[in-house]
Amino acid sequence: MRGLARIEQDVLGWVDIELDECGPYDAICKPLAMAPCTSDVHIVWGHAYMSDAPNRVVGHEATAEVIKVGDKVRDFKPGDRVIVPAITPDWLTVPAEQGFSQHCYGMGTGMSFVTFKHGVFAEQFHVNQADANLAHLPEHVSLEQAVMISDMMTTGFYAAELADIQPGDTVACFGIGPVGLMSLAGAQIKGASHIIAVGSRPVAVKVAKEYGAHDIVDYHNGNTVDQIMDLTDGKGVDKVVIGGGGAETLSEALSVLKVGGIIGNVLHYDGIETIPINGLSWGQGLADKTIRGGVCPGGRARMEKLANLVEYGRFDSSKLITHKFDKFEDIEEAMILMRDKPRDLIKPAVILE
């Protein structure tokens, strides 16, 4: 079985692998669509904590066809078309019982692809606990839409959930890469009234406006905090979602956040051990400003609800895809694109049908 793997630090290449055994509750799938993520880039070329295992296949964003199921699987059969969530936890753990399935064995370990086993950039791949971790692909949801639901949509929307956005809230969205754009779309669907997006690339600005951004703050045009405060008549924003940025982003978010506001962060600060916070913007700890950051939950129920939003026309996740490929081997080129991030890129994807 061939797959695209992290051979060692900074080396991406093809390997032959053996799949994990299909247990009684598991499934074996073959990809119909795949997309690389910034997390894959971190794993190969960065400082990601998820895995440093050699010769491990990367990838955790896919839609697929079920090839084989274990004899205890009830709701899926060979031939079914499915969305494969990026987060496929072990649901038989205490953290899962407590509502944190994404951390089933410790921080972020619900992303079992790459963390514990080969990922989805292979001719076939293994999915644990299929009834809980696969989602049926609705007939009227395209492969392009579905592969963006598997990680980008669920992660971005989680930022809006963490921020507890309420109808009428003014929201600042830091970062308009693929996750940031999904955070923005999540804010729109949750009822934000005035959405301010921070970013500069024209291709992303266009999609940000289509997803509901009312104002765009370009950090090349001046201080980000000053621009947001000007757009809100000095009041600041009720909520902030962070889907992109750098070490300084959290302090900027605190600076524009009203007293009592909430920040929802899904940005992975790769390689940054210490994140600075401006004490004054946090009221030196007394401003009742809440910082919440996390990995999105996983599993079937969440995927199927998100797919409903797409199926019934509330939202089109496929707008993220700017570079599309059609051969299995093209996933390597897509990975390099995701690493290099040309200005006309939001998200590459490989669509095999």
Give the positions of each predicted feature.
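Mid-domain Rossmann-like dinucleotide-binding core that forms the NAD(H)/NADP(H) cofactor-binding site
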Residues: V82, H136-N221, D226
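N-terminal Rossmann-like NAD(P) cofactor-binding module of classical short-chain dehydrogenase/reductase
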Residues: I83, D238-V241
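Glycine-rich beta-strand-centered segment in the early N-terminal region that forms part
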Residues: D20-M34, H47-E97, H118, P138-V141
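Glycine-rich phosphate-binding loop and adjacent beta-alpha segment
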Residues: K209, H214, G246-R314, L352-E353
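Short amphipathic alpha-helix with an adjacent loop that forms part of the alpha/beta core around
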Residues: T224-G234
